[in-house]
From Swiss-Prot:
Organism domain of life: Bacteria
Name this polypeptide is given: Adenine phosphoribosyltransferase
Similarity-based family: Belongs to the purine/pyrimidine phosphoribosyltransferase family.
EC number(s) per entry: 2.4.2.7
Organism in which the protein naturally occurs: Sinorhizobium medicae (strain WSM419)
Location of the protein in the cell: Cytoplasm
HAMAP family xref list: Aden_phosphoribosyltr
């Protein structure tokens, strides 16, 4: 484990049995509240793409907005919010995606992506990958080229990374936690 990984892990609060028994919730709000850890996480997520053409960063509601906005700023890119259905005010495009216990829908503004835009997809954590897979498919349907999908945390036992890789998306994560 690198010093960076150790620092990030120590900046994340783990809450047992939330939101339900048997789940270990990884709360990044403590990382966000720690200026040094927050900067290091953003810098590390941005580093591989500095000097790469990135037109937009797409953040998945809600923590992906925080991380994605900071990454977009550092890359001088635009930002695309990907939101739950009914939360955006203009003409939207929508996709249904699978959750652990059902189906939900997310959407983005129809004019948020120009075909050929190079986009980085961002969220705080990848677990089963249903939400990230839905967001990636939505971006691809609109003609975006996904440069990468970036997450602070990977829960590898849940297989989300494989879903994105099956779509041809390069996945970048900073730390892993075993279990869920």
């Amino acid at each position: 484990m690198t010093a960076l990984q150790s620092d990030l892990i120590s900046a994340i609060r783990s809450i047992p049995d939330y939101p339900k028994p048997g789940v270990m919730f990884r709360d990044i709000t403590t990382l966000l509240g720690n200026p040094r850890a927050f900067r290091r996480a953003i810098d590390e997520l941005v580093h591989p793409y500095a000097g790469t053409k990135v037109d937009k960063v797409a953040g998945i509601e809600a923590r992906g907005f925080i991380l994605g906005g900071a990454i977009a700023h550092q890359l001088s890119a635009g930002f695309i919010p990907i939101r739950k259905r009914g939360k955006l005010p203009h003409d939207t495009v929508r996709i249904a995606y699978s959750l652990e216990y059902g189906v939900d829908e997310m959407e983005m503004h129809r004019d948020a992506v120009v075909p050929g835009d190079k986009v980085i997809l961002v969220d705080d954590l990848i677990a089963t990958g249903g939400t990230a897979e839905g967001a990636a498919k939505l971006l691809q349907q609109m003609g975006a080229e996904i440069v990468a999908a970036c997450f602070i945390i990977d829960l590898p036992e849940l297989g989300g990374r494989r879903k994105l890789e099956a779509l041809g998306v390069n996945v970048r994560t900073l730390i892993e936690f075993e279990g869920h």
